[in-house]
From Swiss-Prot:
Name this polypeptide is given: Large ribosomal subunit protein uL10
Example of a GO biological process term: translation
Family per record: Belongs to the universal ribosomal protein uL10 family.
Alphabetized UniProt keyword annotations: Ribonucleoprotein, Ribosomal protein, RNA-binding, rRNA-binding
Any Gene Ontology CC annotation: large ribosomal subunit
Transmembrane segments annotated in the record for this chain: none
GO MF annotation: an example: structural constituent of ribosome
Gene: rplJ
Role, per record: Forms part of the ribosomal stalk, playing a central role in the interaction of the ribosome with GTP-bound translation factors.
CDD domains named among the record's database cross-references: Ribosomal_L10 (cd05797)
Length: 170
């Protein structure tokens, strides 16, 4: 890899570290190609991406960023899983780690916050953005449904009483 290629990789990694909602750093020594493809597929399905980069280039890219604290994690065979959604990549990486002993989460970053392995696992347990939006929408819609039910209830009760009177008269 020549100098121009290295500079391009550093620039790409810098954009990843600056713009991603979450970055998960893990060791992947011992994973097969099939395992790596599975990891990439899971993270991609969650809306993220996976990247293997030279540690030295990743450390250069991290220098001067808000998440420079994760540069200490860049030792050995490291892989980055990242996504714009602050939960997606962490959730996919955590699920993959539970099934593969050779994939060891070291830590990561969420926004400007540096996370250890337990922090990444805690983020993975959080509901995704879509789940939060749907639960908020459900909470907002529930009072309207209750009001509509309350408005319609007296008419339904009157109809029920009239029906009962009619049955007794017959």
């Amino acid at each position: 890899m020549d100098r121009a290629q290295k500079e391009k990789v550093v620039e790409e990694l810098g954009q990843i570290f600056e713009s991603s909602g979450v970055v998960v750093v893990a060791h992947y020594q011992g994973l097969t190609v099939a395992n790596m493809q599975d990891l990439r597929g899971r993270v991609r399905d969650a809306g993220g991406a996976v990247r293997v980069a030279k540690n030295k280039l990743a450390k250069i890219a991290l220098d001067g960023t808000d998440v420079a604290g994760i540069s200490d994690l860049m030792t050995g065979m490291t892989v980055l899983a990242y996504s714009d959604d602050p939960v997606a990549a962490a959730k996919a990486a955590d699920e993959f780690a539970k099934e593969n002993d050779n994939y060891v989460i070291l830590g990561g970053a969420m926004g400007e916050n540096i996370l250890d392995a337990d922090g990444v696992k805690a983020v993975a347990k959080m509901p995704s953005r879509e789940e939060l939006i749907s639960s908020i929408a459900g909470c907002i819609g529930a009072p309207a449904a209750n009001i509509a039910g309350a408005i319609g209830a007296p008419a339904s009760n009157i109809a029920s009483v009239l029906s009962t009177i009619e049955e007794k008269a017959a």
